Amino acid sequence: MKVCVIGLGNIGIPVLEYISQRGFQVYGYNVVEKSIKAIETFTGWEDVPKCDVYVVAVSSNSVEDVCKKISNKNKNSLVCIESTVPVGTCRKISETFDLSTLVHCPHRFWVEDPINHGVRQLRVIGAINEESLRLGLDFYRSLDIPLHVCGSIEIAEMCKIAENAYRFVQIAFAEELRMICGSRKISFDDVREACNTKWNTEIPEAREGILGACLPKDTRYLRLLADSAPLLDGAILTDKNYQKWIKRS
């Protein structure tokens, strides 16, 4: 079986290396040249061999363009979208580009702790149809990746953005608490430590604001699905206020 990993960034490179270690014939594709030891990579799409499986690990806004390329090369391949996408994206892509076997198995890779939260960890998978699910399960199980099967591909899409929005809200609460503690001249770190002695309480750290792309982007994706989402709106506003507050402190 030939596999191509598309997008060789923080997620794609570990995925590429992991698949190679499992004994697959694997290639990498990235628009900017990346050199991976003992693995053939390409910057020209026309140079990529025709593969049985394409693993998509590009930024969210590049997924559609990549899937169009896959369709033009081998529309009968299994397409595994690991990138985070808005709900409804995967099915729309499959219909637009006539991709009949497509699954969504969003990554849970954490760059700061690849040992405990790397490529191989429990993940969700959803598919556009039964055949896609069968092929997707066969592929990921051959990689020894444990899976929770979702009843639809939309559930898998929603799961990923909900996970990150949930984390966003948790951090926003910590930021709000830190600002309140600051206004009362009480140590936030001491309050947090005390709170976290309770078995069902785990307040995260409040650092420099919710930076990076993933959590803010995915929270916006979830927010756009609702006419009204006061909790998410409040969390987004809290983070904006906190980032201003931390600069003044």
Cite the ranges covered by each PLM segment.
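NAD(P)+-binding Rossmann beta1-loop-alpha1 motif at the extreme N-terminus of oxidoreductases
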Residues: 1-46
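NAD(P)-dependent Rossmann-like dehydrogenase/reductase catalytic/cofactor-binding core
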Residues: 2, 182-249
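Short, charged/polar "capping" segments at the starts of alpha-helices
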Residues: 33-38, 87-91, 131-135, 242
